[in-house]
């Protein structure tokens, strides 16, 4: 059973496609001011997301399936989560990067 899990995990890692060149600014670790929402997007096309709100939490660890404008879907097979990006990555005058995903303003920390 453990071996099957390891093979499945390796197979799932292999499903990620690199970020398109025009979306490379999405890559990095992003966090909300209260640290309750965190997302890491790798250049290889994987998402590690957590949203820890009082009484409700969610997390996603999956490859990015596709982009639709600024939004993106992450998941495997028929299971997927849409991330609504209302502000794509943008650098302010001080050189800090921000974006808004699912209504949460996130700052790039790495």
Show where each model-derived region lies.
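N-terminal glycine/threonine-rich, aromatic-flanked beta-hairpin/loop signature
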Residues: 35-80
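Structural signature of eukaryotic scaffold interfaces centered on beta-propeller domains
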Residues: 90-91
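Edge beta-strand at a domain terminus
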Residues: 98-110
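Sec-dependent bacterial lipoprotein signal peptides
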Residues: 1-16
């Amino acid at each position: 059973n453990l071996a099957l899990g390891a093979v499945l995990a390796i197979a799932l890692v292999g499903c990620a496609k690199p970020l398109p060149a025009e979306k490379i600014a999405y890559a990095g670790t992003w966090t909300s001011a209260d640290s309750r929402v965190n997302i890491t997007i790798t250049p290889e096309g994987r998402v590690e997301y957590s949203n820890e709100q009082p009484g409700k939490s969610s997390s996603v660890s999956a490859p990015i399936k596709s982009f639709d404008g600024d939004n993106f879907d992450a998941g495997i097979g028929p299971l997927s989560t849409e991330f609504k990006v209302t502000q794509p990555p943008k650098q302010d005058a001080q050189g800090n990067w921000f974006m808004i995903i699912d209504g949460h303003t996130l700052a790039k920390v790495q």
